[in-house]
Amino acid sequence: MSSNVSQEVEPLRLLAVHAHPDDEASKGSAMMASYVSSGVEVMVATCTGGERGDIQNPALVGDPHSARDMGGARRLEMANAAKILGIQHQWLGFTDSGLPEGDPLPELPANCFALKPLEIAAAPLVRLVRRFRPHVIVAYDENGGYPHPDHIMAHKVAVEAFHTAGDPQKYPGTGPAWEPAKLYYDLAFNPQRFRALHFALEEAGLASPYAERLAAWLETDTEGHTPPVSKHPTTTQIDCGDYFETRDNALRAHATQVDPDGFFFAVSAPMQRKVWPWEDYSLIESRVPTTLPENDLFAGLR
């Protein structure tokens, strides 16, 4: 494989791969805003348009624009969120697969993102990697963060792009080869973070929004006293608490998808800064030397 990463390090560039508009705001947005403020170029690739999303904000139920054109509404929301975060943004152009429900589960809709052959689904992302030339790619884990079919496919295309964009024999016609240096999985739903916030809230005499989630994790643990061990441990924590309000504003920009009185806003930004001022990641592969644990996704590159 040909590698260009050592040929050009400045400016540093990061690419985050997400399934739907709004995912970038709920997973890693404070980290991205922090890096943007320090001069890093940050790009978000959104695999689908979120056309099959439901309205999650009670205040917008029955909104005629969203009901008539959910895809159009979410494009406007994504543009607003990108502006708030200061990031660059690229749609990859696939159709939302929706979240199947029922027993048995219904078939996914024809031609949706999750049913695309991998080489077709990954090609636009490989093209973007070769054009944007990121040093770091941030992706979901094998479970997609949670098992939505589009999240699982977003994981697959991100890993495929990381492994093939530097090979000029792969994906011909998508631009000159570029080999990213590091691949991370996002750990937005880190049980350690939820536990720390939960107990801090209890100690302060405040209601915790994490009680049910923690109870569910405890039920799945064979020992019954600690959360299940993650397949991908935290290797890297980014101190970005100063950007939690920016994160929250980006979330609110996705008005159809986010309840402003809901789970994401149940704990104040100052409390989160005090207890857990980081966003958490797991280093999956590095083509540059680095030492764990890290406090910088670009460790080994500067």
Each PLM stretch: what is its role?
Residues 1-15, 102-106, 110-302:
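Metal-dependent de-N-acetylase/amidase catalytic core
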Residues 1-133, 160, 282-285, 290:
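Active-site rim/loop-helix segments in enzyme catalytic domains that contact anionic ligands
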